Each structure stands twice: as structure tokens, then as C-alpha cells.
């Protein structure tokens, strides 16, 4: 079934019916027009919801898997070998204290927090702010329970 078969467009809304299950789909990043390396962290979170095993191979920036250990704190079953991560989906993620290491990792941790059971605290959100202006405000408008708080252990490094 195609995504367009799951969408209904009404006067003031788009209604999307989710699938009963998400099938795992392995991807390889590539330069345009291939799968963008900037989306592989988010794809990893989607694979956490899938029913089965899939791989993400980053052929552009092979060192962009710093989010995997943090997702592991939330219960993601995955392992990294070189420029590839294997994700074993189907495990419910749990809220945890996690720390973002870069822009892409930070948004993947926010997405993971949105689907996790319990509360997730994402630290070092200054990474997130570099690419997503007032994301918590926008997500709140969509009904997501999210807010910005300051924790000393998550604060940006002080300049000398």
C-alpha cells in the first residue's frame, strides 16, 4: 500500500491512517539524489519501531553514529560496525536522560523521546537550536508534551 492510500485531504486537515506495523527497510546514504546522510539518525529511530532487523550504512559520513549509544540508554537494540549500524526493531523505547552530540543526533533523540514510554531528558540542546528554531514550541502545537528546562549537567560548555 502506498502512503497516498493512507491520506485523506479534507477542507482544513490531512488525515493519515498509520499502518498496522512498520516493516524494516535497510538504507545506504549517498550523495544527491540518494538517501541523505542528514536523515540517517532519524531513520534509525523509525527502525526502532519496525518489526525486525535492518541496517543503515552511511557511505557519505561514516562516523555519524554517536546517537546510537544514547538511543541504547532508551532500550534500542543496535550495534555499530564501521560505517554501518544494525538495528533490531520491535522493542518499546523507555524514557531516559540522554545527551546529544550534534544537530542530527539531537533531533533523533527528541523523536525517540516522543515515542518512548516515560519521560526523556535530552541534554546539550544547544546542538538542536543550531538547526531547529523553537522546536519545542512547534511540537507542543502538535500535541506533544515537551518543554525546555535547564539542567547544569546538560549545560553548554563555558567559554574560557
PLM segments and residue spans:
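Short, structured segments at the rim of ligand-binding sites
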Residues: 4-160
Amino acid at each position: 500500500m502506498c502512503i497516498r492510500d493512507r491520506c485523506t485531504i479534507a477542507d482544513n486537515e490531512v488525515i493519515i491512517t498509520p499502518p498496522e506495523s512498520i516493516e524494516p527497510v535497510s538504507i545506504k546514504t549517498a550523495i544527491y539524489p540518494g538517501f541523505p546522510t542528514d536523515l540517517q539518525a532519524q531513520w534509525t529511530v523509525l527502525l526502532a519501531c519496525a518489526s525486525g532487523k535492518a541496517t543503515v550504512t552511511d557511505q557519505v559520513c561514516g562516523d555519524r553514529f554517536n546517537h546510537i549509544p544514547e538511543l541504547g540508554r532508551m532500550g534500542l537494540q543496535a550495534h555499530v560496525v564501521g560505517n554501518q549500524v544494525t538495528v533490531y526493531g520491535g522493542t518499546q523505547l523507555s524514557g531516559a536522560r540522554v545527551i546529544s552530540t550534534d544537530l542530527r543526533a539531537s533531533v533523533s533523540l527528541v523523536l525517540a523521546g516522543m515515542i518512548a514510554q516515560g519521560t526523556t531528558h535530552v541534554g546539550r540542546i544547544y546542538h538542536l537550536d543550531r538547526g531547529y528554531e523553537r522546536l519545542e514550541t512547534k511540537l507542543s502545537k502538535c500535541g506533544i508534551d515537551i518543554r525546555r528546562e535547564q539542567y547544569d549537567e546538560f549545560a553548554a560548555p563555558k567559554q574560557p
